[in-house]
Structure formats: C-alpha cells, structure tokens
Amino acid sequence: MSDPFYPHGHGGAAGGEGAAAAGYSSYEVDLIAARYGGRPLANPSSAAADLDARLAGARRSMGVLYHQPIMGSHSTVEQIEALYSSNTMTKRPRLESSLPIYPQRPGEKDCAFYMMTRTCKFGGSCKFDHPQWVPEGGIPNWKEQAANVEESYPEQEGEPDCPFFMKTGKCKFGSKCKFNHPKEKVNALASGNTNDKHLIADSSILPVRPSEPLCSFYAKTGKCKFRAMCKFNHPKDIEIPSSQNEPESAVTVEGETDIGSAADSVSAKMQTPVAAAQEFNSKGLPMRPGEVDCPFYMKMGSCKFGSTCRFNHPDRLVLNFPLPLGQTILPTPESMLLNSSANFMQGFDFHAAHMPVGPGPVTYPQRPGATVCDFYMKTGFCKFADRCKFHHPIDRSAPDPSANWEPAEESVQLTLAGLPRREDAVVCAFYMKTGVCKFGMQCKFDHPPPQEAIAKVSNSGS
C-alpha cells in the first residue's frame, strides 16, 4: 500500500535485515518532529541516515500539508489552528482576498448582479451595496427579499377612482397614479358585507356617469356587481323599489355574463323584468298580442327561452279553414249535454278537425315595374318575404313581359366576310389593321371591303 511518507514504496533496511513495518515507531515519530520542528534529536543513531533517505520523497507532501493557501495567503499550522479556534481571545490572522472590491453602501439595496456573479460592470459608479462576504462566483440562486412595507397610494379628492385599485386593492403605478385611491371604500368592499343597506350607504363606490344610460340592475336592486368597472350611470338620488312592492308574476331573465368582458357587454345581457303571459299556444309558448313576433319561433317553430320569452308566439295552426260542402254546425241543445263543462264542444266539428292543416298563405309584396324575383318565379317561395325588393306576381304562369323583351333588329348590310357595313359610322380600326374583327356582326363600326379599305388608306396617306 502507498504511504504519504513513503511515496516510492517501502524498501529493505541497510544490510538486508528485514522489511520496515507499515506503522511508525516512537523513534521515527520523534525523528520526523525533530527534523521539521527545528529541535535536535537527543540520541541520534545510525538509523537516522537511512530514515532521511527514505523520507526524502515525502518533503513535498509535508510542505503542502503545512503550507496551505487560504484566500491567497500562506498560513502555517499555528495560523490555521488560531483561525479555527473556539477561543474568542485568540488572535486570528488577517485574511487578505485577491477579489476586486466594489463600493460599500450600507442602507442601499444589494446589487443583484453582484450577488449572483461577484462582479459588477459599473464598478465604483454603482449606486447599490456590494457586501464583501459574497464568495467568489457569487450566489447563483440569490433572490432579493421584498421588504414587508405597505405601499401608500395617493388620495386625490375630485379625481375619478382608480378602477384597478378599486377592483384588486393594488395599483402598479403607486404614488405616480393620477387617480383617487380611497382606502375606506376598498376596506368596505373587502369586508364582505353585501346587504342592501351597506351597498346603498356606500353608493359612492359606484360611478356616476350622467352622459351614459342608467344601469338597469342598479335601478332595480340598488346594487351593481361590477362596481367601479360598470360603464353605466349610477345616480345617488334614485329611489330603489322594495322587494315587497314587486309583483309575484314578474319573472327575471338573467343571462350569465363573463366577468372578464362585463364592462363591454353589460347592455346586451342586462336583466329586465318580463310580465307573465296570460295565454299560451299549443306548444306552451307565451302569446303576447301587441309584442313583436319571436323571429326564432317564426322561423324554426320552437323557442329556447320557453315561457320566459318576451316576444309573441302566435299559434301557427290555421283553425279558420273552410268547411266541406253540405256541412253545417248546429248548436247542441243543453238537454243533450252531460254537464255544463262540455260547452266548449258545442261548436266543434270532428270531420273538419281531421282535414289536413297546413300553414296559412304567405303574401309576397307586389312591386309592378320592378325586377321579378327569380327564386320566387322558380319555386313559389321567397325567404325574404315582405322585405324582398323585387316583384312577386300572383300568377307565376303568366309570361314576364320584361323577360321576353328583345331589342329591335336593325337591317344591316353584311360584307362577304360577314361583317356589318355601316357607312355612316367610323371605320373599325382593328379591322383596318388585321382584316378581321372579333366582334363580328355585333360591331358598331364600319367594315368596308378590302378594295375600298385599301383606297381609303391610300387617300388618307396622300
């Protein structure tokens, strides 16, 4: 095995007397201490010379052991022991560092780049603090600890409330924000009180916008869940109706509104009261005479809002159909009725009820002089109905005079090439250059025969 005192291995003793033991005797320990400690050996023997020869290769290792560099300086064993001593009275050696020194600014924030890399490109001009205890290479995972100090926001009376501060309680602009930051309003919202009295008492939280429409939800309940973010008007002198005065037949239709886009689409989904219908059609949908017909119901025959829909849903069944010839409705004597509750069957005809019932006739607009609606003439149907701007003749089989109109044919003399002769018109320039005309008989210019064309060219050239 290798040994730090015998880097070249153990050799035999002088004279060939056995091999040296792996451990050291007390004499060998005293010899090593005397050689490197500066003390003379009391009883030197002849074995000292042999031991010096064997320990010659260990001098470098011992030198390294007793001369370790600490932060650029060379320390002895006594200095190392003093450095790590637990005695507070021991004088410790001053450690000198070869790393660059940057400005120390106690009270300022630590230079983030210096703390992570132990370097700073600004050098002495850096305005931050550079502690000397940072090791070489810096602290890669260093993060600045945020000071636990509550930031104050400006309260500017007369200015609009900061919407982001009213919603979150924070403002990224801090003291530079030009809006008002009322702390008492934010504390009132964060307290969680949502009763009517609290909201009405704190109605100053809601924005007053005289030029905007009235917030309908605020007018009904005195509350507004969008608070300062609402873009509608919230007057403070409005009378809030109590819940006891509201009729029980009022049904509130409320659409779910996304809070992220509420400020832009509140008007489209705001809640409005709808009175309960008194009559319903055969499908159970409300009939509201005087209201606009439900467009979806008129087109598809159904309505996803059901009984809460505010539009009219007329019964699409045509009950006023003509009776077959020879049938009359006779009143039934009261003596033949089983009870008085069967009076509704008095004027009902069962034969007529089994006749096929279809939608009523649709009348399309008559616009004489306008263009005939092609789709209506082909199919007898027009999806635009009374909004169509074309003419819808009642008799589709009648010929359309405008469709059969043809321009009066002119008597035009043709040349041997089949091109028109128009002596009172200008000569066709393309025909004079190439001898042909792509428009043929439809060309409105003159096409003289070749001999006449050559004569015209020669006369014009002379």
UniProtKB/Swiss-Prot annotation:
A zinc finger (C3H1-type) spans 105-133, 156-184, 209-237, 288-316, 367-395, 422-450. Disulfide bonds: none annotated. Signal peptide: none annotated. InterPro entries: Plant_ZF_CCCH, Znf_CCCH, Znf_CCCH_sf. The keyword Zinc applies. Keywords: DNA-binding, Metal-binding, Repeat, Zinc, Zinc-finger. GO terms for molecular function: DNA binding; mRNA binding; zinc ion binding. This is Zinc finger CCCH domain-containing protein 8. The lineage of its organism: Eukaryota, Viridiplantae, Streptophyta, Embryophyta, Tracheophyta.
